[in-house]
From Swiss-Prot:
Phosphorylated by host SRPK1, SRPK2, and maybe protein kinase C or GAPDH. Phosphorylation is critical for pregenomic RNA packaging. Protein kinase C phosphorylation is stimulated by HBx protein and may play a role in transport of the viral genome to the nucleus at the late step during the viral replication cycle. GO terms for molecular function: DNA binding; RNA binding; structural molecule activity. Residues 155-177 are annotated as: 3 X 8 AA repeats of S-P-R-R-R-[PR]-S-Q. The modification Phosphoserine is found at residues 155, 162, 170. It comes from the Viruses. It comes from Hepatitis B virus genotype C subtype adr (isolate Japan/A4/1994) (HBV-C). This is Capsid protein. It holds the Pfam family Hepatitis_core. One of its GO terms (cellular component) is host cell.
Length: 183
């Protein structure tokens, strides 16, 4: 089966794959963040949101995986085999859990639309040749709160300039004047 855990949230595994693996905090840090911000909702018997449910499931999977890894570590005699299992879990499964935890915590913190806009922005940024892109990648916390992901299709109707604005005053000139007055 080809199951994409992000599909119902408007994202894809491919979209998250644009973010480098070292972008995601450690599982421990993500679990601490989830507990600090959302413990009450995660432990509540009430259904809060699909993101809370997905976060609960990811946390439970990680706990079970750590239980299995501990059992394997205690019962595998061969140190080389033990190291292979530990490395596999940390590298492959750990990354998937880190991505899941990050995605759902970010959606709860910033809003799903903002996170999707960030993923698209980062994907465009990383896909642009270095000579043609800004030196710094987009940062999730600095995206405007009113970010909207536009659906493909008709372009929005263009607005005509307000008749009250005099054309001789350019926005740049006004901004620079206001900066000088603030200093």
């Amino acid at each position: 089966m080809d199951i994409d855990p992000y599909k119902e949230f408007g994202a894809t595994v491919e979209l998250l794959s644009f973010l480098p693996s070292d972008f995601f905090p450690s599982v421990r840090d993500l679990l601490d963040t989830a507990a600090a911000l959302y413990r009450e909702a995660l432990e509540s018997p009430e259904h809060c949101s699909p993101h809370h449910t997905a976060l609960r499931q990811a946390i439970l999977c990680w706990v079970e995986l750590m239980t299995l890894a501990t059992w394997v570590g205690n019962n595998l005699e061969d140190p080389a085999s033990r190291d292979l299992v530990v490395n596999y879990v940390n590298t492959n499964m750990g990354l998937k859990i880190r991505q899941l935890l990050w995605f759902h915590i970010s959606c709860l913190t910033f809003g799903r639309e903002t996170v999707l806009e960030y993923l698209v922005s980062f994907g465009v940024w990383i896909g642009t040749p270095p000579a043609y892109r800004p030196p710094n990648a987009p940062i999730l916390s600095t995206l405007p709160e009113t970010t909207v992901v536009r659906r493909r299709g008709r372009s929005p109707r263009r607005r005509t300039p307000s008749p009250r604005r005099r054309r001789s005053q350019s926005p740049r000139r006004r901004r620079s004047q206001s900066r000088e007055s603030q200093c």
